[in-house]
Amino acid sequence: MTLTSVPAPVSLFPELELPPLPYHRPLLMIGHGTRDEDGRQTFLDFVAQYQALDHSRPVIPCFLELTEPNIQAGVQQCVDQGFEEISALPILLFAARHNKFDVTNELDRSRQAHPQINFFYGRHFGITPAILDLWKARLNQLDSPEANPQGIDRQDTVLLFVGRGSSDPDANGDVYKMARMLWEGSGYQTVETCFIGISHPRLEEGFRRARLYQPKRIIVLPYFLFMGALVKKIFTITEEQRATFPEIEIQSLSEMGIQPELLALVREREIETQLGQVAMNCEACKFRLAFKNQGHGHDHGHGHHHHGHDHGHSHGEWVDTYIEPTAYHEKIWQAP
């Protein structure tokens, strides 16, 4: 069969060696989606770089919402090439509702349309040593004389860790955990955690709390994979804070972007998916608790994906207030 996928450029990381795949199964890399063209293109470039490291199977980009191609189009591309098994990876940082609920719903639709296809659903990135080390290395760069000409000590510096925000408290808790793990032992005065939408405290409140420590420097860490409207919003607010409080050195790191550490992590997740070794802790899942409290069993049994605990959700009478993806997305822009 002919393998078609993202046109792969020359790899930016030819020295990066990935472990071999057990199977030559096509891979859907599923991004969140953004209306921002820069963010969309960066995700496509990320997928292309991953494909460039291994041409043994097609790697196909698609998006959950807000832009094209969507998940159904990605699945159709695999079907058109005659594949009967598909690995699907959510390129998401945390296991919020998109990962637990929305992507799985889309894969259910695909399974109904293509019952001959066997789907294998993988795991989000989560909290990993590779990502922690990446952020530590980026912070180390800000200690250089070029980035820190005033020589401000870490003890006089507050980290401001900015997450996207989620309706799922499990994911929000992971943001706090990541911030804490990054800060402990770093030598910085403290870390404040905030969100750009959905959740509280918001970024402006995060700045206010950071100033209470009377720091000489605040470093903003936007915990995002790729550029997009929300990252640009973080940068805009940071510029406003810099102009309002010129006595404080306010710096901001960029989003993570295309990094070899992330490409290696994708390979880990792809191998997990192929071997059926994906595992998640569902004990604190918001959706499980909602069903349990209303007398429903939490099925955890979407047949289309195989990952350790068979994470899925039986759709009973529980009312999902974010059932429309557009309504969920728009809430992130609403004022408290």
Curated annotation (Swiss-Prot):
Basic residues bias: start-end ranges: 299-310
Keyword terms: 4Fe-4S, Cobalamin biosynthesis, Cobalt, Iron, Iron-sulfur, Lyase, Metal-binding
UniProt cofactor note: Binds 1 [4Fe-4S] cluster per dimer.
Pfam annotation, one family: CbiX
BP GO annotations: cobalamin biosynthetic process
Superkingdom to which the source organism belongs: Bacteria
Entry binding sites for Co(2+): 32, 98
EC assignment: 4.99.1.3
Record-listed [4Fe-4S] cluster binding positions: 282, 285
Pathway(s) the chain acts in: Cofactor biosynthesis; adenosylcobalamin biosynthesis; cob(II)yrinate a,c-diamide from sirohydrochlorin (anaerobic route): step 1/10
Region span, Disordered: 296-316
EC category name: lyase
Cofactor: [4Fe-4S] cluster
GO molecular function, one term: sirohydrochlorin cobaltochelatase activity
Catalysed conversion reaction: Co-sirohydrochlorin + 2 H(+) = sirohydrochlorin + Co(2+)
Alphabetized SUPFAM superfamilies for the sequence: Chelatase
InterPro entries: CbiX-like, Sirohydro_Cobaltochel/CbiX
Subunit architecture: Homodimer.
Function as written in the Swiss-Prot or TrEMBL entry: Chelates cobalt to the cobalamin precursor as part of the anaerobic pathway to cobalamin biosynthesis.
Similarity-based family: Belongs to the CbiX family. CbiXL subfamily.
This protein's name: Sirohydrochlorin cobaltochelatase
Organism: Synechocystis sp. (strain ATCC 27184 / PCC 6803 / Kazusa)
Recorded name of the encoding gene: cbiX
